[in-house]
């Protein structure tokens, strides 16, 4: 399992697309957080805070993570190596988890350079160090859980097709709906007392809490459950090839 985990990370980092994805992620964040005069611009925000990063990152993740996961199973299917992979002395779940943790690790690798933003704000804030570090680290944890949820979706879409582009598009659609769809339905106020429950089904309400540095057990359970559902759907998808 560990060998497969390392193989997935190496395969991504040894490809041009891997570096392009990471560079694009950092470039978009840098431009919106420091250059473009938008609501996310940290200097215009008026005080030392990483809140802008945690507000914008989910929207970048909608494209970044599907780009990371789109090849994980679809490429194996297209090249025919999926059959060899599934005959290895590993269970389907072990194969899925190796790829899942590889995907999460790649998300972490993409996030790590943003610590430069944190260091910059910490040093140049007035006074220096005038930033809520506890809340910031809590927000990073929330971003990690969000990334893990998106990775689980990307794995599933990659497992149901041998076309990487199709897997990429499907992952974007499902992650976008999971993050924004329930919030939009809630805003329409169509179901009365059920609206709040509908909102709680979406990722955004749980991420919003964690992005403020609030680590709530209910949010952790939600993210674990969400990832587990899509991991099981991926397992079912792989097992269907044996029927």
Residue ranges and their predicted role:
Residues 16, 22-27, 95, 103-111, ...:
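Hydrophobic alpha-helical membrane-insertion segments
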Residues 30-34, 47-60, 98, 102-162:
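Secretory targeting signals
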Residues 36-48, 167-237, 243:
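Terminal transmembrane helical anchor/hairpin motif
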Residues 53-75:
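Long, hydrophobic alpha-helical segments
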Residues 72-102:
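Helix-loop-helix units of permease transmembrane domains in multi-pass membrane transporters
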């Amino acid at each position: 399992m560990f060998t497969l985990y390392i193989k997935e990370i190496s395969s991504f980092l040894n490809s041009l697309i891997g570096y392009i994805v990471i560079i694009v992620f950092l470039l978009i964040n840098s431009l919106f957080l420091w250059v473009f005069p938008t609501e996310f611009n940290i200097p215009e925000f008026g005080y030392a805070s990483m809140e802008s990063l945690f507000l914008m990152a989910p929207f970048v993740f909608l494209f970044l993570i599907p780009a990371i996961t789109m090849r994980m199973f679809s490429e194996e299917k297209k090249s025919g190596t999926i059959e060899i992979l599934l005959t290895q002395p590993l269970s389907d779940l072990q194969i899925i988890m190796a790829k899942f943790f590889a995907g999460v690790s790649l998300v972490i690798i993409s996030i790590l350079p943003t610590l430069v933003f944190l260091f910059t704000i910490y040093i140049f804030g007035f006074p220096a160090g005038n930033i809520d570090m506890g809340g910031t680290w809590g927000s990073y944890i929330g971003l990690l859980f969000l990334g893990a949820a998106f990775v689980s979706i990307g794995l599933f879409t990659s497992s149901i097709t041998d076309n990487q582009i199709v897997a990429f598009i499907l992952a974007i659609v499902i992650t976008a709906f999971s993050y924004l769809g329930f919030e939009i339905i809630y805003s329409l106020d169509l179901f009365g007392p059920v609206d709040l429950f509908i909102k709680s089904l979406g990722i955004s309400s749980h991420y919003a809490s964690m992005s403020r540095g609030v680590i709530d057990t209910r949010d952790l359970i939600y993210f674990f459950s969400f990832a587990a559902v899509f991991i099981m759907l991926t397992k079912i998808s792989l097992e269907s090839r044996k029927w």
